[in-house]
């Protein structure tokens, strides 16, 4: 059983979906959870057209069915989880199926069918994309799906699990290589003195002992006046942030803004200094890591211009 939650993988992750189709032809069941009847939903045994923003009630409604029908994996829960009693009581008290169906717009019978198939499957996976992560409550959306996997024991074993399908090219590779404010290469903690010392020796440079800011934290720091200068590389926050008007206001009031990009973006138009980057995808050596964690070598096509 595969639950594709907020993911139109047929179009956005075609290689991944090719393997899903192979599974369907061997008898696997696909459920598509999406407000739109996408090309992915066309292949699904069940389509759950939830109202936008009701992912958590729907996930908790699925949990309600599993708990009500006694389909939870008790052995796994006792061995590998904590807080189950409080979770069970909250779900059973607050997410009765009639309420969930009313809030989400998904028929109760469809929710029950998916919940039972997922819980009873020998192997089951939940995969999601930006459909649930580009929300103000994105973390809670994902946690509600993780709870389903923990409830049924569909995690930590072959053929089952949780699979976030990344939203942009090489997001996984960037994370692997430490392009995160709180992690070093290989997702080693930047605040771990042993890991930090190892990389300081390799790189021959000191590393700050505290984690940096995520993008959201950067904008909060701008509001507080703690962040006064910004160097933006290949990003367009004036247009990509959820509240573009507010983001633009904060960017305009920085003391110094530098933007490096191959295009004159909306953010670049606000900059004090614009560095016209070259087409690095054609001029760089490196690697790209895809959603199945396959690392591909990238060789440059042309040498960068001198200077």
Residue ranges: model-predicted function:
Residues 1-170, 176-177, 189-307:
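Cofactor-pocket helix-loop regions in the catalytic cores of large enzyme subunits
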């Amino acid at each position: 059983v595969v639950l594709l939650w907020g993911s139109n993988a047929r179009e956005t992750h075609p290689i991944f979906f090719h393997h899903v189709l192979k599974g369907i032809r061997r008898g696997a069941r696909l459920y598509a959870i999406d407000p739109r009847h996408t090309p992915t939903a066309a292949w699904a045994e069940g389509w759950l057209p939830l109202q936008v923003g009701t992912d958590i009630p729907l996930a908790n409604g699925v949990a309600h069915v599993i708990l009500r029908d006694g389909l939870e994996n008790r052995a796994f829960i006792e061995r590998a989880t904590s807080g189950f009693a409080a979770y069970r009581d909250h779900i059973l008290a607050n997410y009765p199926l009639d309420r969930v169906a009313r809030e989400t717009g998904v028929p109760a019978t469809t929710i029950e069918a998916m919940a039972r198939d997922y819980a009873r499957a020998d192997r089951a996976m939940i995969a999601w994309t930006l459909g649930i992560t580009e929300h103000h409550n994105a973390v809670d959306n994902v946690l509600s799906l993780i709870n389903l996997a923990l409830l049924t024991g569909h995690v930590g074993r072959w053929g089952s699990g949780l699979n976030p399908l990344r939203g942009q090219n090489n997001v996984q590779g960037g994370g692997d290589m430490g392009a995160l404010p709180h992690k070093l290469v290989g997702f080693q903690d930047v605040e771990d003195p042993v890991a930090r010392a190892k990389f300081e020796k390799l790189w021959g440079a000191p590393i700050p002992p505290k984690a940096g800011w995520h993008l959201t934290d950067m904008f909060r720091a701008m509001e507080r006046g703690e962040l006064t200068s910004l160097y933006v590389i290949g990003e367009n926050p004036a247009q990509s942030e959820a509240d573009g008007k507010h983001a633009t206001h904060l960017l305009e009031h920085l003391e110094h803004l530098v933007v490096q990009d191959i295009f004159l973006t909306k953010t670049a138009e606000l900059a004090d200094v614009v560095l016209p980057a070259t087409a690095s995808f054609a001029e760089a050596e490196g690697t790209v890591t895809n959603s199945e964690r396959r690392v591909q070598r990238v060789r440059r096509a042309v040498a960068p211009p001198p200077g």
